[in-house]
């Protein structure tokens, strides 16, 4: 899980999910996981 100032989709299978005030990117590729906030 990478903590970033700006998260974005890296590939077509990445999904942006908002949980509360946090923004996550989840993907079938575990390297693409990101968190903001």
Curated annotation (Swiss-Prot):
Keyword Phosphoprotein: no
PROSITE patterns: RIBOSOMAL_L36
Keywords: Chloroplast, Plastid, Ribonucleoprotein, Ribosomal protein
Signal peptide from the UniProt entry: none
InterPro entries (UniProt xref): Ribosomal_bL36, Ribosomal_bL36_sp
Entries under Pfam families matching the protein: Ribosomal_L36
Coarse class of the protein's main subcellular location: plastid
GO cellular component: chloroplast; ribonucleoprotein complex; ribosome
GO BP term, example: translation
Localization of this protein: Plastid, Chloroplast
Superkingdom per UniProt: Eukaryota
Gene Ontology MF annotations: structural constituent of ribosome
KW RNA-binding (keyword) present: no
Listed transmembrane segments: none
Family as reported in the entry's similarity comment: Belongs to the bacterial ribosomal protein bL36 family.
Protein name: Large ribosomal subunit protein bL36c
Organism encoding this protein: Welwitschia mirabilis
